[in-house]
Amino acid sequence: IVNKFLGDGFLALFGAPLDAADAAHQAVGAAREMLDAMGHINAASDWPLRIGIGIHFGEVVAGNIGSPRRKEYTVIGDTVNFASRLEALNKEFDSQLLISDAVREALGNDGDDAVSLGEVPIKGYDQPMMIWQLG
């Protein structure tokens, strides 16, 4: 579910509002499809575009948030913030798809093509976090 648009980006939810045991797989599958589609678009263009995707997996606070006059279903919490930080790191690593250690673990053998970028300092976090790149 595309939950909201944020400037030139968007927040997509997998496993909310309905629980999905394979949410990490769904998110990575969608990301790979977007990258594939971008490759086809760029092949037919003189102005190639790049996208950056960050995927994290974990618990969130989900529900209708807002005033009584305008409520909006959304998710908040550290998981959302961390995914946003991952997305922003794509510029630093010249990458397009970064995932957290939690996503890598949830993928199991389906994440065997993940390349470790090591423990990376993340803005707003005291300890460096293990980051993985997918192609």
PLM regions with names:
Residues 1-29, 73, 91:
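Catalytic NTP-binding/metal-coordinating core of nucleotidyl cyclase/transferase enzymes
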Residues 6, 23, 30, 57, ...:
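Helical mechanochemical/support elements of P-loop NTPase systems and associated helical scaffolds
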Residues 6-7, 45-54, 96-101:
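Acidic/histidine metal-binding catalytic segments
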Residues 10, 51-57, 131:
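A structural signal for short, well-ordered beta-strand segments
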Residues 14-18, 59-67:
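Active-site loop/short helix in cyclic nucleotide turnover domains
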Residues 16-53, 78-89, 112-113:
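Alpha-helical scaffold within the catalytic cores of cyclic-nucleotide enzymes
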Residues 60-62, 83, 89-135:
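Cytosolic regulatory/linker segments at or just downstream of nucleotide-handling modules
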